[in-house]
Amino acid sequence: MKIVDINERLAISGQPNTDEFINFARRGYRSIINLRPDGEEPNQPGNDAEQAAARRAGLAYNFVPVIGTSITEADIQAFQRAIATTEGSVLVHCKSGTRALMLYALSEVIDGRMKRDEVEALGHAHGFDLGRAVTWLKRQAIQTPRVSGFFDPRTGSIQYVVTDQTTKRCAIIDPVLDFDEKSGATATTNADAILAHVEQQGLTVEWILDTHPHADHFSAAQYLKQRTGAPTAIGTHVTKVQRLWREIYNLPTLSTNGSQWDHLFADGDVFNVGSIKGRVMFSPGHTLASVTYVIGDTAFVHDTIFMPDSGTARADFPGGSARALWSSIQAILSLPDETRLFTGHDYQPSGRHPRWESTVGEQKKANLHLAGVDETTFVALREARDKTLPMPKLILHALQVNVLGGQLPEPEANGRRYLKFPLNALEGAAW
């Protein structure tokens, strides 16, 4: 196995045997980054075996599985983090070394340390063909809009800033207000990171959009509205969710006309992010109110379709329906195959890095709940799986905030805000 030194900290290689890891440590490497998805070849060691070998050799280890034809910015960010968090020399491997050098080149271009027209020469200098990296950069240059994802590890949620590069106007989608259920503390760490990005990029926020009332985190829509002045919006069927949860929470004074948001979108409504056209697709199933935002060549599909290796979202919340979810997913998959899909959650199966971008074509081909599956099979699979899933730990905390558009309950006489829990309201939920 040939090791190619790229710089003083980074080397790349093809697939090593696990018994070589101890020699890597002796040669001064401090970390191994494995870029190969499990199952690429029958005889590859795989993530578990490599992690164990790294531990025995005293090496740090990161699993960042990528496919050369579907690398996303989330993959590049994970590659950068894996290198940045390691002191000393790093050995990155895939099958041949090409993906490793491709990720390095893309990282350098995105961060401005390398020009796009220098990528091919970098590959030739080290004996690799980086044609795919050149193609990736050309494709990225014409994609509209520009999408930046912000992953919240506490809830597995992804928040988005969707930008029209021409006008520097943007929309924020599904922002998270931090909440610690053990202490009852709230914070704005996630939202402030989004605001910092907006400021750094010189953007004007045009919309603050929620895809549905979330059951696993508080919405930061109201906080961001206060900070930016941008209007908030959600799908018009949120009123059905408000009526449903008004009864569950016994909140007779809760207004259920959606007035907590500045705008309610109906199915088919259109809007703009700068000069880019957007439209709204009603996408029920996960909740009664779920919508998909189609903006330029992207669709923000919330809790309908997860990444292909994760499948689809649950449909057993009050008002949910696996059959309705199937119909919503089929409408999303009727978009052009090259449409970029951005999911609402990622739970990092097999310990991989967070990912959130795919395409319609990739989902049709590889989603483990959808590829080669008909409606009857999907509904049976989804309903059976949902019976085994415990409720999200924040569902009763989050929904009483999110049916108010992200507004916290009003302070009581002592100046404190309180949440209210119904007992035994979610009958049949798994523990």
Swiss-Prot record:
Cofactor: Zn(2+)
UniProt keyword annotation of Zinc present: yes
Gene Ontology terms for molecular function: hydrolase activity; metal ion binding; sulfur dioxygenase activity
Binding site for substrate: 309
Residue positions binding Zn(2+): 212, 214, 286
InterPro entries with a match to the protein in the record: BLH_phosphatase-like, MBL-like_hydrolase, Metallo-B-lactamas, Mito_Persulfide_Diox, POD-like_MBL-fold, Prot-tyrosine_phosphatase-like, RibonucZ/Hydroxyglut_hydro
Keywords, sorted A to Z: Hydrolase, Metal-binding, Zinc
GO BP: any one term: glutathione metabolic process
A Pfam family assignment: BLH_phosphatase
Induction section of the entry: Repressed by BigR.
E.C. numbers: 3.-.-.-
NCBIfam families in UniProt: bifunc_ST_SDO, TIGR01244 family sulfur transferase
Miscellaneous note of the record: Probably part of an operon that comprises bigR, PD_1892, PD_1893 and PD_1894.
Family, similarity comment: Belongs to the metallo-beta-lactamase superfamily.
Function: Could play a role in cell adherence or biofilm development.
Protein name: Beta-lactamase hydrolase-like protein
Organism: Xylella fastidiosa (strain Temecula1 / ATCC 700964)
GN (gene name): blh
